[in-house]
Amino acid sequence: MTLRQNKVAIRLGNFVFHGDDFGVIIKRDETIVGDVWTFMSLSSGDITMLREHQLTPYTRRKNGTVPAENMSDKQRRAIGLIEQNLQINWNGRTMEDVSTFIGLFKEASLMVTRKQRQRSYDQYAGLDGFD
């Protein structure tokens, strides 16, 4: 049996299908047998570890859905910051995907920003005008 190779690379943060189940990739582990992806189902919330050949990239939006290109500048900036802070990749196609992505990753992105700010302030801790 020949394994089907995905033409589109799967990356952390991507929406993907596992069979008929739609979800998001939340972790990648490099193992001696290849990459193992942690998949979170958006319908049930179940988390499953899968090999890449068990996943199908999300490449097209369903007919009748509003395209992600209609997102506001504020949403576009939020997605860009989330990608930058968490080192993940956006591949959504619809406005529902925009909402889901921001809802899933916004808090984690804000925590990264807070930690970075705190570290920059910590270097001044204990200093006074005479140090």
Would you name each region that the model predicts?
Residues 1-12:
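Mixed-charge, Lys/Arg-rich low-complexity intrinsically disordered regions
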Residues 21-30:
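Short beta-strand-centered aromatic/proline hotspots
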Residues 34-38:
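Short aromatic-glycine-enriched beta-strand elements
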Residues 41-66:
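Intrinsically disordered, low-complexity, charged/polar segments
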Residues 62-131:
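A charge-rich, low-complexity, intrinsically flexible signal that marks solvent-exposed coils, linkers
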